[in-house]
Amino acid sequence: MEEFKIPATMKAMTLVAYDQLKLAEVPVPEPGPGEVLCRIKSVAICGSDPKMIHGGYKFANWPPYYPFIMGHEWAGQVVKVGQGVKDFKPGDRVAGEAHVGCGKCDNCKRGHYTVCLNYGKDGKDGGLDMGHRHYGFYWQGANAEYNVYK
């Protein structure tokens, strides 16, 4: 299995307030059970990104807090896996998607995770407590050197 040298900190483009981006040095996240740490190689800018920067999604509570790392269309490489991960290994090339459903509701079980029934259920964080992640919107995104994905 390939091993990668992972630094303690990384550079990330953070949204610190509406219309204010700042390049920051932040800790590299550690993958938990069922998660992978990816080295981000490229990130696209989606039409939703400028709108979020300029405050166009206040009604949806995007971003949920500051500083926030945006970015949900990316490609990279797995550099470390968390406990229980069997489908990926360090060195695998990957591309990301914005949504990870809860895996428990009827829609997720049918493979329709982008319409997860637990998304946004609590009205504040997109359903994180129910297992749903929306990277770059409610959960830290890929405008950084590394990120953890489920």
Model segments located where?
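NAD(P)H dinucleotide-binding glycine-rich loop of Rossmann-like/cofactor-binding domains
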Residues: 102-150
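Short N-terminal binding/cap micro-motifs at the start of the first secondary-structure element
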Residues: 19-23, 47-48
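Glycine-rich beta-strand-centered segment in the early N-terminal region that forms part
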Residues: 27-43, 57-109, 114
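Basic/polar N-terminal segments that are highly enriched at the extreme N-terminus
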Residues: 1-11
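Generic structural detector for well-ordered beta-strands
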Residues: 25-27, 148
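Cytochrome P450 core scaffold surrounding the K-helix E-X-X-R motif
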Residues: 48-54
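A secondary-structure boundary/capping signal
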Residues: 17, 39-41, 150
